[in-house]
Swiss-Prot record:
Signal sequence residues: none
Gene name, Swiss-Prot/TrEMBL: pyrF
Protein name: Orotidine 5'-phosphate decarboxylase
PANTHER family xref list: OROTIDINE 5'-PHOSPHATE DECARBOXYLASE
UniProt function note: Catalyzes the decarboxylation of orotidine 5'-monophosphate (OMP) to uridine 5'-monophosphate (UMP).
Species in which this protein is naturally found: Campylobacter lari (strain RM2100 / D67 / ATCC BAA-1060)
A molecular-function term among this protein's GO annotations: orotidine-5'-phosphate decarboxylase activity
Amino acid sequence: MKLCVAFDVASYDECINLAKELKGLDLWVKIGLRSYLRDGVKLLEAIKKVDNFKIFLDLKLYDIPNTMADACEELAKLDVNMFNIHASAGKSAMCMIMERLNALSKRPLVLAVSALTSFDEQEFFSVYKQDIKQAVKDFSKISYESGLDGMVCSVYESLLIKENTSANFITLTPGIRPFKENSDDQKRVADIQCAKDNLSDFIVVGRPIYKAKEPRRICENILEHLK
């Protein structure tokens, strides 16, 4: 299981300072919509210069198939190791994306977002008209059949996805509160042991790290628990 640190901070300088603080640690960096809209490609390049961190670009692309495929080809030109799209875009979009990316000599990992961890069961049903478990099964099936590399999901759907697809189908799980910290705006959260039990491949941790007085010490503690 790998640690992915969410750099969801308020400025470019804070991102770079956090990267410097974590230099040398075996982890991935997640750059989300806020940071990418604010700082763009220069942030990705600057983080790579601090240390050759692997980068997960968390933009959750969602559009018509051709537009998504074009965008994903552009993303593949960036120095990122993984990005995500919404499974709700459907199988046609996912197949087109993977056909384009697989024609390249090198491509990033591509994950599909199932149900945002900010959803509880009631709110999810009001949008999708089915329960989370069934939707995740459906989304994971079409994502796997389309050739994607894995899913973004809550810890509580990780095992379900692997059982429905393959043990090698990646699950990346946000909403991790390593030592049972406050869940903030996340609804379906879990700790490290729960992530281990549910065979998560990546855990995403943000606020418990970047809001800490000693982010490096927190990361080292998490990495020790992942062994």
